[in-house]
Design a protein with these regions (language model features):
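Basic-flanked hydrophobic alpha-helices used for secretion and membrane insertion
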Residues: 35-186
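Alpha-helical transmembrane segments
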Residues: 23-34
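N-terminal Sec/SRP start-transfer signal
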Residues: 1-25
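Charged, alpha-helix-enriched surfaces in structured cytosolic catalytic cores
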Residues: 1, 32, 164
């Protein structure tokens, strides 16, 4: 009886099978597009900001840092500080490069997804810097590599006179985000 009913209503059954197929295909497409959108938005944010993070807080107090560290909703806290700004080298005096310090969490976890290439190591000594080719070019130092030294006149916002120091390149990185920076030790 079911067999006879099935063959008698071929048109209806074909429409029903097509409707089920299209519904499954539509659900699959929606979920695929949705998941891809979320992944691509995260990738875009990493490439635009140069970090895998959700928030930035400037000028945090010690109490705010402790509150974030004790919060179960905060997964990681990376600290970054502006150590100064480049004023001149022997080759160029129109620089746009900053001197930045970052802690281990920021460099190893938050900044890592935005880095495409890293040679050498993060600065440990006071006179070491981790550079990008873009920052070296901005300072007129495009031919330098790991182990090379250069003299830089730099300033900070502490109201002191500009200082001159010889830095040694301990690493070179490339990736996304701001590239006109020299990472320095604490």
């Amino acid at each position: 009886m079911a067999k006879t009913s099935f063959f008698r209503n071929k048109g209806k059954n074909l429409v029903l099978v097509c409707a089920v197929f299209l519904a499954v295909f539509m659900l699959f497409s929606i979920f695929t597009v949705g998941l891809t959108y979320v992944k691509m938005e995260k990738r875009q944010n990493i490439r635009l900001s140069g970090e895998d993070m959700d928030a930035i807080m400037y000028g945090m107090t010690k109490e705010q840092v402790k509150k974030c560290e004790n919060s179960s909703e905060v997964l990681k806290i990376g600290k970054v500080g502006v150590a100064g700004y480049a004023i001149s080298t022997q080759w160029d005096d129109t620089l746009h490069t900053g001197l930045i310090y970052s802690d281990k969490t920021y460099w190893d976890e938050i900044k890592a997804p935005a880095r495409k290439e890293t040679k050498g190591h993060y600065p440990k000594q006071e006179n070491e810097v981790m550079v990008t080719q873009t920052a070296l070019e901005d300072c007129g130092l495009s031919g330098l590599g790991i182990g090379d030294t250069f003299t830089l006149t730099y300033g900070d916002d502490n109201g002191t006179e500009p200082k001159e120091k010889t830095f040694k390149i301990c690493g070179i990185w490339d990736g996304y985000g701001t590239k006109k920076v020299f990472f320095v030790s604490k």
